[in-house]
């Protein structure tokens, strides 16, 4: 199951209700974690051992779902990343805002 972050929920509501304009990110990036990200943009993303977020592209949504339109491949780990079980989609290659998160 996946969820939108508080940041994205607020941006979409403000955009729909004409109290702010949401600027779509130029690119989105997939990040990984060993536990759930939280709606408030907290959580512990992987670090070190050759880890970095990877850019992803997605097809247009249909019936409330979408999927990545190309493989998202992470570089080989140079040490343990632990048991990766969760993903986050972010609006920047580092830092930035969590948009969507969920478990594998």
Regions flagged by a language model, labelled:
Residues 1-87, 91-104:
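Small cysteine-rich, disulfide-bonded extracellular modules of the LU/uPAR three-finger superfamily
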């Amino acid at each position: 199951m996946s969820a939108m972050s508080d940041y994205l929920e607020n941006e979409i509501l403000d955009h729909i209700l004409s109290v702010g304009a949401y600027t779509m990110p130029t690119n989105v990036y997939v990040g990984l974690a060993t536990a759930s990200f939280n709606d408030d943009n907290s959580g512990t993303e992987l670090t070190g051992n050759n880890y970095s977020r990877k850019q992803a592209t997605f097809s247009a949504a249909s019936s409330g779902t979408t999927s990545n339109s190309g493989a998202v491949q992470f570089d080989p780990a140079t040490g343990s990343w632990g048991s990766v079980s969760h993903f986050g989609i972010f609006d920047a290659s580092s830092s930035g805002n969590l948009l969507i998160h969920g478990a594998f």
